[in-house]
């Protein structure tokens, strides 16, 4: 190596610059802005801490019931927390959590994930299209 006296300090400066944000956050001991969610009225299907950790598993279970086992519109979900029975559908969630932007997106953006659920499914804040193409096809295939 011809320019050791320049290369080694440059590598050290790069490493220090790269790791400074990590060291700063480790020393400060803060997480930054943690989102605060609007508490909906009533009870959720399960308790708040369980839902924060496992809501995706619950939604996947409901999806499996609807798609693979033919429970159209979802089946019946028996809550372990309240003992009540709920309709296993995202519409059950939307009855309390009426804004995807104010509820779902805040936490998902905070942890840096982008679920693909909403590429196909509608949310309460999105207007459903009125034209599905079926009317057009029924003219030709009646």
Curated annotation (Swiss-Prot):
It is a single-pass membrane protein. Heme 3 binds at residues 117, 120-121. It is found in: Cell membrane. Its main location: membrane. GO terms for molecular function: metal ion binding; oxidoreductase activity. The chain crosses the membrane at residues 7-27. Residues 1-6 are cytoplasmic. Coiled coil: none annotated. Keywords: Cell membrane, Electron transport, Heme, Iron, Membrane, Metal-binding, Oxidoreductase, Transmembrane, Transmembrane helix, Transport. Heme 1 binds at residues 93, 96-97. Binds 3 heme groups per subunit. InterPro entries: DsrJ, Multihaem_cyt_sf. Residues 28-142 are extracellular. GO terms for cellular component: plasma membrane. The keyword Transmembrane helix applies. Heme 2 binds at residues 104, 107-108. The keyword Transmembrane applies. It comes from the Archaea. Has menaquinol-oxidizing activity. HmeA, HmeB and HmeE subunits may together catalyze electron transfer from menaquinol to cytochrome c. Consists of five subunits: an integral membrane subunit, a cytochrome b-like subunit, a cytochrome c subunit and two iron-sulfur subunits. This is Hdr-like menaquinol oxidoreductase cytochrome c subunit. The gene is hmeE.
């Amino acid at each position: 190596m011809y320019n050791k006296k320049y290369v080694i300090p440059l590598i050290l400066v790069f490493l220090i610059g790269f790791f400074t944000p990590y060291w700063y956050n480790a020393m400060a001991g803060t997480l930054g802005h943690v989102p605060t969610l609007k508490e909906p009225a009533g009870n959720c299907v399960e308790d708040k801490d369980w839902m924060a950790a496992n809501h995706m598993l619950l939604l996947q279970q409901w999806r499996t019931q609807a798609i693979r086992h033919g429970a159209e519109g979802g089946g019946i979900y028996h809550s372990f927390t309240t003992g009540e029975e709920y309709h296993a559908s995202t519409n059950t969630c939307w009855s309390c959590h009426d804004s995807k932007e104010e509820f779902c997106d805040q936490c998902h953006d905070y942890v840096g994930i982008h679920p693909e659920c909403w590429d196909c499914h509608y949310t309460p804040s999105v207007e459903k299209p009125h034209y599905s193409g079926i009317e057009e096809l029924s003219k030709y295939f009646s």
